[in-house]
Amino acid sequence: MRFSRRDFIATTAIGSASLALDLQGQSKPATGAAPSVNPPKKAVIISAANGYNYLDRGYAVLSGGGDTLDAVMQVITGPEDDPNDDSVGLGGLPNEDCVVELDACCMHGPTRMAGSVAGVRDIKNVSLLAKTVMEHTGHVMLVGEGAQKFGFVMGFPKENLLTERSRKTWQLWRETMSNDDWWGPGLASPKFKFPDTAFNVSEYYDERIKRMEKLAETIGIEPEFCMAAIERVLNPPSGTIHCSVVNEKGEMSGATTTSGLAWKLAGRAGDSPIIGAGSYTDQDVGSAGATGNGEENIKV
């Protein structure tokens, strides 16, 4: 049995968000008309954990009568601006060439419009850039150099996104001289083997950690961040932030932004900038986003 994105969101919404959104229930996926959804009694914002500190900014937009997508942007640009959040925006972990490349997408429920960018360098707020693609072009997605040029033309400043902390973490990864990279078969391949440095290979773990601790000290990684940096080398993170909003009118919007999989090959795009993979909003049903291994999510 195959499910459409609408069916998937409808089933998920009914199963896990009925209380928050005051849904009039359907226990099965829609087979024709969209399920009936009442507007919530109060506006609702959902976000990945790294957006929690910025929820008040989103609610401030909604309480002032602002648009749901503007509220989403207020939440997710917070982590993009934070140099200590290495999953998105400024300070995001770089690719294998030590270059930060960012992806984002957004969807506006009331107008059913969408915008997306992928592989963007030197522009911090790619969530806003995706929104600008939606509002000022006849396209849905721009990528790489074209997306960057469009951003500069539209007034986005050119910024160095690589912080010293992220650069040193990359250096720690590079200097381990290991096979912990993204060449070769992926997770879904029967030929895939976990690298020798994976956490579940205990016979190598303690010795490897000690060597990496010494190397981290030599590189200049702060002692309090040392183990976090080592963990990022051994288990490259795929951090993302998604945010979805619904107001009292039942209007919805959603967006996802990320610096992608750490140490990825240059030019790699995961699920985050892909409409229907990293984020999807259906005004008649609901809004959802994803985080984790983008390659696997795209195939679902």
Where are these regions (language model features)?
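Alpha/propeptide regions of enzymes that mature by internal proteolysis
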Residues: 2-4, 10-13, 17, 28-300
